[in-house]
């Protein structure tokens, strides 16, 4: 095991030059998943990566698994519902036991915001945060940035662009990571949600989706995270969607004189977060985000493991 290693717990762990390096490498992989150099394949060939997901995941865990395999590494994905944590073993003890088996990297997701930072204290191999509570999801922010980088033609073209986050911003680790990263790159940010879904923030906010659409070059829709709510905020998700769904009508009325793109980290609540017709529209970049998830996670794993 390496004596020194890098972790990726939040986007601030990366310098701007490192972010540019990841974007360049991920762009190559997004264009061709098989464009892995022989040198990289040789370095990754005997690497063993463990995925410890204590929360459900479809896109993130699958894309990390595919990214690992495309690089030539092996990945062990543990089912935490059938692990010893269900018998009362603590998070720290589970991690220490897996760590004792000397994997080359560990990818973790947990409901507690502090979990990856605590685990990093014990880790002598690269630790990647695949989502921690409401705090951080760095690889999601990086793949979203890759999607913007591709669409607008480089980082230099992102400065001054306007992005509106619409939905459950307060409970979204995706929004939190994206906001911190995009602020570093000079984007203007607006948050749009009912009061109960907005964090305390100096950023510009609105309760009006029409205002957000008129403001933005980029819309980032967010799922309503009812599992993190102490009490119902709306009578139903349909009632929420009536007020905050991104629809063709709203776009044609309030974004008719400009190009606008729409992102969502998934899972999408169709006709609640985004109207089905909008999801199929060329302005929707949702499936590009999914593809870019594999490419960016390939770049991240290569960056952390190609020693």
UniProtKB/Swiss-Prot annotation:
Q: What class of enzyme is it?
A: transferase
GO CC: one term? cytosol
- Extract the HAMAP family matched here: Asp_carb_tr
Report what the protein is called. Answer: Aspartate carbamoyltransferase catalytic subunit
What's this chain's function?
Catalyzes the condensation of carbamoyl phosphate and aspartate to form carbamoyl aspartate and inorganic phosphate, the committed step in the de novo pyrimidine nucleotide biosynthesis pathway.
State the SUPFAM superfamilies in the record. Aspartate/ornithine carbamoyltransferase
Its subunit composition reads: Heterododecamer (2C3:3R2) of six catalytic PyrB chains organized as two trimers (C3), and six regulatory PyrI chains organized as three dimers (R2).
**Which organism is the protein's source?**
Helicobacter pylori (strain G27)
Which residues make up the binding site for L-aspartate? 87, 173, 223
Keyword Transferase part of the UniProt annotation = yes
Positions bound to carbamoyl phosphate: 59-60, 109, 137, 140, 266-267
Alphabetized Pfam families for the sequence:
OTCace, OTCace_N
Instruction: Show the catalytic activity.
Output: carbamoyl phosphate + L-aspartate = N-carbamoyl-L-aspartate + phosphate + H(+)
Give the source lineage, highest ranks first. Bacteria, Pseudomonadati, Campylobacterota, Epsilonproteobacteria, Campylobacterales
Any one Gene Ontology molecular-function term assigned to this protein's record:
aspartate carbamoyltransferase activity
List the EC numbers from the record: 2.1.3.2
Q: In which pathway does it act?
A: Pyrimidine metabolism; UMP biosynthesis via de novo pathway; (S)-dihydroorotate from bicarbonate: step 2/3
Look up the domain of life of the source: Bacteria
Annotated GO biological processes are: 'de novo' pyrimidine nucleobase biosynthetic process; 'de novo' UMP biosynthetic process; amino acid metabolic process
Keywords associated with the record:
Pyrimidine biosynthesis, Transferase
Q: Indicate the family of this protein.
A: Belongs to the aspartate/ornithine carbamoyltransferase superfamily. ATCase family.
